[in-house]
């Protein structure tokens, strides 16, 4: 463990210093795009490994430490979440507010209440005063990620900082999967989707990484807009029919505000058909809300399926056998081991 921490700390230091010496307007140059696995029927050797929030099961989510860890593992892509600050900086953070389960103030104390600390009400300089490098003991997050290693001193990074680190620290070119966080149900919590998506696309173009990036969102308005302003960037349609978030709203009167004007009931409840109508080719459902039949039908429509976010070996294996094209996971190390072992067994005479 000490050896791993030493290697990671040195890699992070090199990456951060390398990025810090470049002016903000100067791009880090990266290698060429690689093609993620594709095909109508997924096999072990063609499953895309996408690190969720970097590698949140192993290092603090959405931090440079997590993305460096994902690079070390050798993922095909990293997934991250973006929001806009009060001074219009694109930062990498999952929640609309600072999360008390992972956030400490500059005096080292855990946040007690996030209600007055919305990301869009804080400047980048203010956000950089918070430490997000450790899980709060006994918190739900701590129970969710028992293997996560603390990395004290980690700050909320900007999208540009993550891009720079990936270009400098990954041994192979990987894809960048950016989830844009906006909500139609509480519009004051974020700027309009057009504003955020345009800023993200602008950064991708300036950093010369748009050819190996994908845009994800539960708010399909972002995806439809990206398809108009940057059709070369693939869009990935997220879906969840849960209690705290339901962007599909099957059986409810009228179109879901999340689905860019589409009503799922007009498509007999078929999310792949709705995605096709929106102009999409990639679907990312919650892994517990997809069946082998749905995956097969999505493939018949030319839509690839990338599930999120199973972390147990049994769930990963089951999903691979169901035919998914890729898995977004907090434990890319486990997924890589499963694929390596299974591919080796399949290659035996």
Which sequence ranges carry the predicted segments?
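N-terminal secretory signal peptides that target proteins for export/translocation
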Residues: 1-7
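Phosphate-group recognition and catalysis centered on beta-loop-alpha active-site segments
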Residues: 7-13, 17, 21-349
């Amino acid at each position: 463990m000490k050896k791993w921490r030493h290697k990671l700390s040195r890699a992070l230091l090199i990456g951060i210093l390398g990025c810090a010496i470049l002016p903000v307007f100067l791009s880090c140059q990266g290698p060429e795009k690689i093609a993620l696995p594709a095909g109508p029927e997924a096999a072990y050797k063609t499953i895309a490994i996408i690190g969720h929030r970097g590698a949140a099961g192993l290092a603090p989510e959405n931090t440079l430490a997590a993305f460096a860890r994902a690079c070390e593992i050798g993922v095909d892509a990293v997934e991250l979440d973006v929001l806009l600050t009060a001074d219009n900086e694109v930062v990498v953070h999952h929640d609309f507010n600072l999360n008390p389960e992972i956030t400490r103030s500059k005096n080292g104390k855990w946040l007690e209440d996030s209600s007055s600390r919305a990301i869009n009400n804080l400047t980048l300089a203010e956000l950089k005063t918070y430490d997000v490098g450790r899980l709060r003991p006994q918190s739900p997050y701590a129970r969710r990620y028992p293997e996560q290693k603390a990395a004290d001193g980690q700050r909320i990074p900007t999208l540009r900082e993550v891009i720079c680190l990936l270009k400098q620290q990954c041994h192979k070119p990987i894809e960048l999967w950016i989830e844009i966080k906006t909500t139609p149900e509480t519009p004051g919590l974020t700027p309009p989707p057009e504003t955020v998506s345009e800023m993200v696309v602008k950064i991708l173009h300036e950093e010369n990484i748009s050819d190996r990036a994908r845009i994800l969102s539960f708010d399909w308005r972002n995806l439809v807009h990206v398809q108009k302003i940057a059709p070369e960037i693939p869009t990935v349609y997220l879906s969840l029919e849960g209690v705290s978030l339901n962007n599909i709203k099957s059986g409810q009167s009228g179109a879901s505000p999340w689905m860019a004007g589409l009503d799922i009931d007009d498509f007999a409840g078929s999310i792949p058909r709705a995605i096709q109508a929106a102009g999409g080719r990639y679907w990312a459902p919650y892994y517990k809300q997809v069946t082998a039949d749905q995956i097969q039908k999505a493939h018949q429509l030319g839509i690839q399926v990338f599930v999120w976010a199973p972390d147990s070996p049994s769930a990963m294996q089951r999903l691979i056998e169901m035919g998914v094209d890729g898995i977004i996971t907090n434990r890319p190390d486990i997924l890589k081991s499963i694929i390596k072992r299974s591919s080796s067994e399949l290659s035996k005479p």
